[in-house]
From Swiss-Prot:
Disruption phenotype: Mutants exhibit altered gene expression, and after undergoing 16 development cycles some mutant cells displayed reduced growth on axenic medium. DIRS-1 expression was unaffected but Skipper expression was increased in mutant cells after 16 cycles of development. Mutants lacking dmaA exhibit culmination defects including fragmented, transluscent sori, and fewer spores than wild type. Its EC number is 2.1.1.37. Residues 4-366 form the SAM-dependent MTase C5-type domain. Belongs to the class I-like SAM-binding methyltransferase superfamily. C5-methyltransferase family. It comes from the Eukaryota. It is found in: Nucleus. Residues 178-192 have a biased composition (Basic and acidic residues). This is DNA (cytosine-5)-methyltransferase. Residues 178-205 are annotated as: Disordered. The keyword DNA-binding applies. Signal peptide: none annotated.
């Protein structure tokens, strides 16, 4: 297989880059792009490569074509689709860069063979995602076979629930799943799609397309018992007491709003999604850890939370839950809160790596063509 020449859009702290590494494919990241200064600082610290801070919208068709990339990986801004956000979809200016990339895709002379996209669950919300509609319109127009997924790290053995939308697309060729192959990769017949107006907020033309909750042929972890306890993700260079002192939840916060926290014990086998507001806001931003299991809280008494020794996950511990390799480090120039913000905007490396394996795997026809080339080369 040819080397992947990758453009990594919205690169953040390099989740897609690490996904490429873990997948085992031969690749080169030609250029990464992000407007976040701290993300680019850490990307440079990690990979010793500079990300472009130039806005994606300012790149012309000719400039993007000049990279000669055959793979585009991207995790566009999720705020227009988040559960706690305004959900303005394509009316949110933060979608402009993504729409620009889709426009470039229709004009570029040599479009990328492979595309992988990650976003929040709400990106494909039924009846109200014009952005998703435009994505699928573009993929169909440009002759891509594609498959959408809703996947969570827990399915891959990680003690974390973070349901996300993924889409993989391959141009001029079918995707190759290990099993159930005949059930997927179907060409989308636009005449069979529901063409109801988006304005009725009831059904979009793509609502009937199946979004898979698994990767066909992948041996998923189906129960919590198959996941490690969250204590296995703890930083090992500090004792439990030291971790508590370094990341403890302030007592005044526990006394005022303590019962809003999602509390997990050290032997729990799951944790809730960490957002970029972790460590700053409380409800819906991620789990905290009970370091002393000898006490139980009284839901009517916030003072009962104090003996539990409640602390936040460290930034490094969260990256382990996100499937980042142990070699990953944060720049010492970043504060803990800045690290939390970067992690909350990141993605799960393990899931990306498994989807990349499917994306680049040759289908039966491509394997036969490759074998024929090898035979001709031996003559």
């Amino acid at each position: 297989m040819e080397q992947l020449r990758v453009l990594e859009f919205y690169s953040g702290i390099g989740g897609m880059h690490y996904g490429l590494q873990e997948s085992g494919v031969d690749f080169q990241v030609i250029q990464s792009f992000d407007i976040n200064t701290n993300a680019n600082l850490n990307y440079k610290y990690t990979f010793n490569e500079d990300s472009s801070q130039k806005s994606i919208e300012s790149y012309s068709v000719e400039e993007l074509e000049g990279f000669k990339a055959n793979a585009w990986l991207m995790s566009p801004p999720c705020q227009p689709f988040t559960r706690l956000g305004l959900q303005k979809d394509d009316q949110d200016n933060r979608t402009n860069s993504f729409f620009h990339l889709l426009d470039v895709l229709t004009k570029i002379k040599d479009p990328p063979t492979y595309i992988l996209i990650e976003n929040v669950f709400g990106f494909a919300k039924k009846g109200s995602s014009n952005t998703r509609d435009h994505l699928l319109d573009t993929l169909i127009k440009m002759n891509y076979s594609f498959q959408e997924f809703h996947l969570s790290p827990q399915q891959f053995g990680l003690a974390n629930q973070r349901l996300r939308y993924f889409c993989i697309a391959k141009r001029n060729g079918k995707l190759n799943f290990k099993k159930e192959q005949d059930k997927h990769n179907e060409k989308v017949d636009e005449n069979k799609l529901n063409n109801n107006s988006n304005n009725n907020n009831e059904q979009n033309k793509y609502d009937n397309l199946k979004i898979l909750d698994h990767i066909p042929g992948y041996d998923f972890h189906t129960t919590l018992e198959e996941c490690d306890e969250i204590s296995n993700y703890f930083d090992k260079d500090l004792t439990d007491d030291e971790l508590y002192e370094k990341y403890k939840v302030p007592h005044n916060l526990l006394l005022s709003k303590g019962m809003l926290f999602d509390i997990k014990q050290k032997d729990s086998k799951t944790s809730n999604c960490v957002t970029k507001s972790y460590g700053k806001f409380i409800e819906g931003t991620g789990s905290i850890i009970q370091m002393d299991n000898n006490f139980k809280a009284d839901i009517n008494d916030n003072k009962s939370l104090i003996p539990l020794k409640l602390r936040y996950f460290s930034p490094k511990e969260i990256t382990r839950l996100h499937g980042f390799p142990e070699e990953f480090k944060f720049s010492p120039k970043l504060t803990t809160i800045q690290c939390y913000r970067l992690i909350g905007n990141s993605l799960n490396v393990k899931i990306v790596s498994e989807l990349l394996k499917v994306l680049v795997s040759p289908n039966e026809e491509e394997e036969q063509q490759e074998q024929q080339k090898e035979k001709e080369g031996k003559k």
